[in-house]
């Protein structure tokens, strides 16, 4: 399996893990993740036991067909899609509206529409390009905790 497919699958499991964690801990607690071919990181004030429980449950549920766990409304893909759409909408609106107040109004309108569209389009981008729930042979190998100052980071290594 190539590095991109591994990253997509780890990204999906990262989303599933964080989704389950967020359903079990206070909602005001910040959390983030980052995936690579060998596994993924979770940054947040959670215990290794909580990470292990959530990651293993997410993997089992995804292997049982719960593909929606791989998609997250908080994913960075949505931010990138929103930024790209807003930039394109602003530039096109200003250019087509003509320079001056009319162009500025059109640019702002286009940017607002682009930001509103970013979540559903970001979801499609996640489904097609950046995540995958297709992980029948995936295994969690190890979970390692690191403390960097105030930040708790867990590394979840996986294999296929």
Model-based region annotation:
Residues 13, 17, 27-43, 117-160:
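Cytosol/matrix-facing juxtamembrane amphipathic
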């Amino acid at each position: 399996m190539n590095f991109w497919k591994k990253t997509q699958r780890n990204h999906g499991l990262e989303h599933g893990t964080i989704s389950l964690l967020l359903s079990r801990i206070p909602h005001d607690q910040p959390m983030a993740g980052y995936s690579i071919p060998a596994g993924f990181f979770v940054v947040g004030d959670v215990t290794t036991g909580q990470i292990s429980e959530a990651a293993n449950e997410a993997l089992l549920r995804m292997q049982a067909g719960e593909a929606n766990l791989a998609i997250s409304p908080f994913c960075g893909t949505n931010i990138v899609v929103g930024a790209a759409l807003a930039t394109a909408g602003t530039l096109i609106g200003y250019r087509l509206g003509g320079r001056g107040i009319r162009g500025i109004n059109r640019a702002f309108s286009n940017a607002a529409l682009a930001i509103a569209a970013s979540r559903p389009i970001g979801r499609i981008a996640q489904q097609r390009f950046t995540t995958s729930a297709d992980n029948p042979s995936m295994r969690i190998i190890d979970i390692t905790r690191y403390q960097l100052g105030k930040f708790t980071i867990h590394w979840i290594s996986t294999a296929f």
